[in-house]
Design a protein with these regions (language model features):
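Acidic/His/Gly-enriched intrinsically disordered linker/tail segments
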Residues: 298-299, 321, 345-423, 440, ...
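Juxtacatalytic substrate-recognition/specificity segment
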Residues: 55-57, 226-346, 357
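Beta/coil-rich, acidic/histidine-enriched accessory regions frequently appended to metallopeptidases
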Residues: 28-30, 53-58, 83-90, 131-137, ...
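Solvent-exposed beta-strand/loop surfaces of large extracellular or lumenal domains
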Residues: 27-29, 78-116, 137, 288-296
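Extended, low-hydrophobicity, Ser/Thr/Pro/Gly-biased non-transmembrane segments
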Residues: 100-101, 109-115, 125-225
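N-terminal, polar/Ser/Thr-rich
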Residues: 23-52, 484-489
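Asparagine-centered strand-capping/turn motif at beta-strand->loop junctions
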Residues: 59-63
Length: 495
């Protein structure tokens, strides 16, 4: 039965330490050291427009036996139309073998000849080359046009899988990483990392960024934008739009965004490096709405920033619906970028946490009454969505879900976190979420890690709570009773 397996949250912290100790002695299993990664992203304005991606890795065999292959997770799902994949090993073409797996695309990369143990100090070259193109039905994390382009998705680049085995070594983060991107003439550009080759003096438009090992996945946004910078709520907010914003609109939006970002920083943990400036970026691509009516404008995210459909800008950047969309995407800086939800937890830990962030920001802004209003709004939207598609279990890959199923399950996931906050208490859940981000940053997480963190902070068993919410359809009657139509709510734990 789900959740029968339990472990201490402290084990999440101890396991990397124990694994590190084994590096001091003779290796006991297969393994590799991920020495270096260099990523190049080039916009190609062909028909159809796409991004050409070149990923060059350097890897060393540090295990106790030869390595004849490694497995890499590649971009998959409706967001990407990955085409023209080519892999070379030591400069020679290698035929990647697709491994059947639910919700992810795994390839086994063969090494011929195998990397022997005698080459323990020798770095080996593996190069991936492929094209990414926006696809209908995707989340809008990639776009390419003559005026702008962006790539903001944690799953856009190969992810090496540690070999199977108790004593195996590996990891997804390289010791060194650089990002090469191109800004077309007249474009503003933002990317992850510290710029080491300034692009203003470059005749080619190439920009090079050095990425720290504890940074999230690389991203890039670029376009021929008008920049408006506003300081509000202790933060700097930069608006990159194709036409100037009304000054009052920009000021109103910046004030709320700065306050909301501060709330997330307090509740989820310190924001990643490079997010001192919050960026709100317009794109000419039609981004699909994850919630609301099909065909409405949506958004996307990158660490410390939001990408908005031009229709959202035109419809009111500082409107309530626009601000909630921006807060939802900003919250995904933590759960989506810093912490990557596992495939079966994408709706719970991705959409659910993002919408829960909207409720957190509302309470910080207007107290319990404002939070109550947002929760009632979520509940109403959930009930409306259920008339079109019943919600699914919150822990399973969303592969094959209809849009309506994603919407109803997404709102239920948000209400789960509201109920969890009521049950655990605001301060204890805050500590649990901060510990979760700190201990698992850069890793895949799911409901097991969340439950362990909450139980560690509260000293209580949340097994039945998780089973009721995650495995069964509908909203528990106890929650509906507390959040009745008259607007009253009776928390079960001190806030």
């Amino acid at each position: 039965m789900k959740h029968a397996r339990r472990f201490s949250f402290g084990l999440i912290v101890l396991l990397p330490f124990v694994a590190g100790l084994s590096g001091c002695v003779t290796p006991l299993g297969r393994g590799y050291r991920f020495d270096q990664r260099e990523i190049e992203i080039l916009p190609v304005l062909s028909d159809p427009p796409h991004l050409h991606v070149l990923v060059s890795d350097r890897i060393t065999n540090i295990g106790n036996q030869p390595l004849d292959s490694l497995v890499a997770e590649m971009p998959a799902g409706p967001t990407f139309g990955m085409q023209n994949l080519r892999v070379t090993v030591e400069g020679e073409d290698a035929e990647p073998h697709l491994i059947p797996a639910p919700a992810v695309r795994l390839y086994r990369i063969p090494f011929d000849p195998a990397w022997t143990m005698s080459e323990a100090s020798q770095q080996h070259s593996v190069v991936f080359e492929y094209d990414l193109a926006p696809q209908p039905g995707g989340r809008g994390t990639i776009s390419v046009s003559a005026d702008d382009y962006h790539l903001g998705d944690p799953t856009a680049f190969p992810v090496w899988q540690t070999p199977a085995g108790v004593f195996s070594k590996g990891g997804r983060a390289p010791l060194q990483m650089t990002l090469h991107v191109e800004a077309l003439p007249g474009q503003l550009l933002a990317a992850l990392g510290e710029e080491i080759v300034p692009g203003k003096n470059s005749s080619t438009g190439e920009r090079v960024f050095k990425i720290a090992t504890d940074d999230p996945t690389p991203y890039v946004v670029a376009g021929r934008y008008v920049e408006q910078v506003v300081s509000a709520s202790g933060h700097t907010v930069a608006f990159w739009t194709f036409a100037p914003l009304d000054a009052a609109t920009a000021q109103t939006a910046a004030h709320r965004l700065g306050a909301s970002f501060e709330t997330f920083d307090h509740f989820f943990g310190s924001a990643p490096p490079g997010t001192n400036t919050i960026r709100i970026v317009e794109t000419k691509a039609a981004l699909p709405a994850e919630f609301g009516v099909a065909g409405e404008p949506g958004g996307s995210s990158f660490p410390g920033g939001v990408i908005l459909d031009a229709r959202t800008i035109a419809g009111g950047l500082a409107s309530e619906s626009g601000m909630q969309l921006e807060e939802y995407e900003l919250a995904r800086t933590w759960f989506g970028w810093m912490v990557r939800p596992r495939p079966e937890a994408q709706i719970l830990m991705g959409r659910g946490v993002g919408l829960f962030g909207v409720a957190l920001a509302a309470e910080a802004r207007g107290g319990a009454k404002e939070r109550q209003q947002v929760v009632m709004e979520f509940l109403s939207r959930y009930e409306e969505a259920r008339t079109k598609a019943a919600d699914r279990p919150l822990i399973e890959p969303a592969t094959g879900y209809t849009r309506e199923q994603r919407v109803s399950s997404g709102y239920k996931a948000a209400l789960f976190f509201v109920a969890l906050e009521d049950a655990a208490g605001n301060e204890r859940l805050r500590r649990a979420m901060r510990h979760l981000v700190r201990a698992t940053s850069g890793s895949d997480v799911g409901d097991d890690e969340l439950r362990s963190a909450v139980e560690e902070e509260t000293g209580r068993d949340f097994g039945e709570f998780f089973r009721t919410w995650l495995n069964h359809p509908g909203i528990p009657a106890e929650f509906l009773k507390r959040y009745s139509e008259d607007g009253s709510a009776v928390p079960t734990a001190s806030r």
